[in-house]
Amino acid sequence: MTRVPTISKDSGFVDAAPAAGQKNREYPGIPTTCDGSEAVVHVEVNVTQASGAYPITSSTNMGGGYNAAVSNGYRNLWGEPLVFVEPESEHSAATFCEGFAAAGGRVTNFTSGQGLVLMKEVLYTIAGKRLPVVMNIGARALTSHSLNVHAGHDDVMSVADVGWGKIGRAHV
């Protein structure tokens, strides 16, 4: 069972000056253990203004973590409140991201599998307009005979031609 991180404005995500009697750590950051989804949420709630995402396995925890941050009143590094929109489909989530970025905002999306394939049409327009949208993809296999929630890169490769730069990471 994967846990959804609880993020609040008091969670200490932004490093503060050390308390009296404490020394600076050699490597700044938060000493913790987490999975890849939690690491993504940690970064995205600090550097974006909004997320448009529709929950789909294996990216549900990322959207849930971002939504938890919004619900708890968390603000990004610039002190701006976060916005989370969960529309009726992945296609609409990508369209929200396109509009938010076109208006000048920093926006992210969390998706995987068939959801990524569904939003392919919008990915072309985002790339064509050179909009700064970040897609966090919990890569997963696609099959024609049944749903598959296992790891794979079929979904990522199915949108390889849309004009986006891609960065992959196997371990956090």
Q: What are the roles of these predicted feature ranges?
A:
Residues 160-168:
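Acidic/polar active-site rim loop that often engages polyanionic ligands
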Residues 170-172:
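Conserved small/polar residues in nucleotide/adenosyl-binding loops
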Residues 1-159:
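Thiamine diphosphate
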